[in-house]
């Protein structure tokens, strides 16, 4: 059994993470303007993920990720420099800004470079209902993937499996520019998939099914995903090539 305490998918504190990203973005903008940038824009993000792949009843991979990143674009007139960093410590952000500025100094001007006009920037941000956090540990995620594959293999015409996957992810990001705009985005995603093989020898066919939702509770059952993958795979059996011909479209 997997030690779920080691790879549990904890729910991030949305407000705390967005505040941290906003501070990082503001630091980048302030440093860029302080160094002489005519205008600048930046995006900071964080992603948390848990992904389990199984095949033929065995766990193949288990991945737990927590990635942060920041990108900064600096404009000197119509010359643009861009740099990114996966480290959001203040000193690293400042170095990233300085690299982008160095690039801008040696980049050919392009009249299409620059920020969007202020009057074209969004001022109202409706709630799109994309944030539905739920804590899932490695054990339960693995069981979902195994159950999904097992359901597909119940079909007697299924001869093999290319595996099943169960995953969950949380993403948060902040975009800001020197025109005073700042926007925040958040979202969750939960998914499951199954890939199966039917037939033998030269008559084998392969197909899949998956389900992906913002809210874990909206997912179809893993058994249904496996059964759909099996039905889609089996219906490919007996397929044959047709002769070249003219047909209505």
What are these regions (language model features)?
Residues 1-248:
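Active-site bordering "gate/hinge" segments
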């Amino acid at each position: 059994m997997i030690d779920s305490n080691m790879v549990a998918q904890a729910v991030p504190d949305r407000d705390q993470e967005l505040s941290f990203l906003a501070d990082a973005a503001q630091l980048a903008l302030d440093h860029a303007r302080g160094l002489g940038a005519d205008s600048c824009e930046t995006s900071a993000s964080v992603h948390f993920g848990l992904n389990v792949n199984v095949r033929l009843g065995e766990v193949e991979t288990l991945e737990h990720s927590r990635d942060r990143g920041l990108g900064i674009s600096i404009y000197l007139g119509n010359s643009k420099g861009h740099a990114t960093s996966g480290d959001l410590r203040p000193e690293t952000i400042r170095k990233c800004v300085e690299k982008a500025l160095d690039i801008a100094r040696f980049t050919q001007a392009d009249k299409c470079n620059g920020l969007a006009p202020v009057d074209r920037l969004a001022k109202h941000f409706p709630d799109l209902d994309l944030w539905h956090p739920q804590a899932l540990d490695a054990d339960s995620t693995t069981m979902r993937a195994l159950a999904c594959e097992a359901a597909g293999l119940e079909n007697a015409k299924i001869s093999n499996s290319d595996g099943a996957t169960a995953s969950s992810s949380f993403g948060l990001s902040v975009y800001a520019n020197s025109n005073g705009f700042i926007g925040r985005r958040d979202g969750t995603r939960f998914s499951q998939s199954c890939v199966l093989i039917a037939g033998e020898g030269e008559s084998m066919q392969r197909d899949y099914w998956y389900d992906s939702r913002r809210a874990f509770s909206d997912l179809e059952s893993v058994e249904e995903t496996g059964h759909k993958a099996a039905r889609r795979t089996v219906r490919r059996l007996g397929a044959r090539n047709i002769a070249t011909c003219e047909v209505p479209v």
